[in-house]
């Protein structure tokens, strides 16, 4: 079994923008590659899990998202593969595109993306983490039995209080993805 770090995309690996629609607008945090490398060196699979309701809302297409992810992988995997998988949910019940306007177990805080990655990458959830910037990310981690690290980038500073109010027991609060990776790296094996 493998251990993994499930990582939210927007606000965690890259700058949060209102519905990232175009690959040209992708701005990866300057420390993201170092952070991902630290986790790889520690023996973790890096798995991105991201809600992309902009597809259901008609703001962009799955083809647009594919181009964004290709650019992300081109940046992060330039020297060595640092991202082992990308899982996304294009669904939202308030969408305008009928095929995506549904309830889905893939949409966080449900754990469908985590379970799919577990199956495809033979992941032991008990030895795995989730790093994200929202209450929804931390709720997903809680629902999946993962260790929870909230980063204060993106919406993290905003959602910290909600996590506390909703009794989400955070394992660590990190300034950013690099701080979170260093925290994991410093834990005993």
Segments from the language model and where they lie:
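Metal-dependent phosphoesterase signature
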Residues: 13-29, 55-64, 78-79, 96-105
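Conserved Lys-Pro-Asp/Glu-containing loop-to-beta segment of HAD-superfamily phosphomonoesterases
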Residues: 105-138
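Substrate-recognition element of Asp-dependent hydrolases with the DxDx(T/V) motif
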Residues: 32, 36-69, 82-95, 141
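Short acidic-hydrophobic, aromatic-tinged amphipathic segments that line or gate anion-handling sites
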Residues: 171-176, 180
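Acidic, Mg2+-coordinating phosphoryl-transfer loop and its flanking beta/alpha structural elements
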Residues: 130-169
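Non-catalytic pre-domain segments flanking phosphatase-related domains
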Residues: 1-7, 182, 186-189
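Active-site neighborhood of HAD-like aspartate-dependent phosphohydrolases
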Residues: 1-47
